[in-house]
Amino acid sequence: MAATAEPESTAKRGTGGRPTREEAARREARIVEVATRLFIERGFDGTSIDAVAEAAGVSKPTLYSRYQDKRALFEAVLQDRIREWLAPLSAAAEMQALRATPKDAATVLDELSRNLLVRAQAPETTALTRCITAQALQFPDLARLAYEEGWLRGVRTVGRLLGAMAEQGQITIDDPEIAADLFLNLVMGRSSKQALYGIEVDVEVQEKRRRAAVALFLAGVRPNPA
């Protein structure tokens, strides 16, 4: 989490009294951090722009100059969570493609599956997913954003990873994105639904399912021996 921002009156200012780029970025991060917490604690309907401004220590005109309404603020929170979700997927894909001696597919997918479950079941992720679900009919564009920029970009990113493995001869797949979609659903399906519905996850059962999901996927994509 970002550190508590300085009040606007004491923040360092650039030429002409305007916030420096660094200070503006810190303030932006603080606003998104506070908004995330309030949306999680109070839900979409229970959170107001005024409450976010007060908790973040910024003036209402400052907040409204950046976000015209609550929907725009929620979109910023959603984009922030999407970046966190995509970061480890992108890193895994890039590392696999750039390695002179690629890591074994089983090792990479085992590590990735662990990371996926941790992030997918984080309280912040689960709570925001509930908010999106509750507001899907009222704000269908936000639901589409979560699906297209979150899930589908995740699928494409894992698809790049699997594509690199295929080029290295470690696996055989016809369509990397279809394979990625199947992998993500195998690994995350049951556990993410339990977290979404507030059902306690049995850690031992989840770990058993995770290992089985990776093994089942690999069994279907390993090249046939000559």
Predicted regions and their residues:
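Amphipathic alpha-helical packing segments from all-alpha helical-bundle domains
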Residues: T107, V118-T133, P140-E167, K208
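N-terminal intrinsically disordered/low-complexity leader segments
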Residues: M1-R26, A92-Q96, N224-A226
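C-terminal alpha-helix
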Residues: L161, L216-N224
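Generic hydrophobic, amphipathic alpha-helix propensity
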Residues: R26-A35, V52, V77-R81, W85, ...
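Helix-turn-helix
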Residues: R30, L38-A72, A76-V77
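Hydrophobic/aromatic-rich alpha-helical bundle segments in the mid-to-C-terminal region
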Residues: R144, L152, A166-A215, P225
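Short hydrophobic clusters on alpha-helical segments that form packing/core surfaces
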Residues: I31-F39, L116, F217
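Hydrophobic alpha-helical connector segments
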Residues: L89-T126, A180
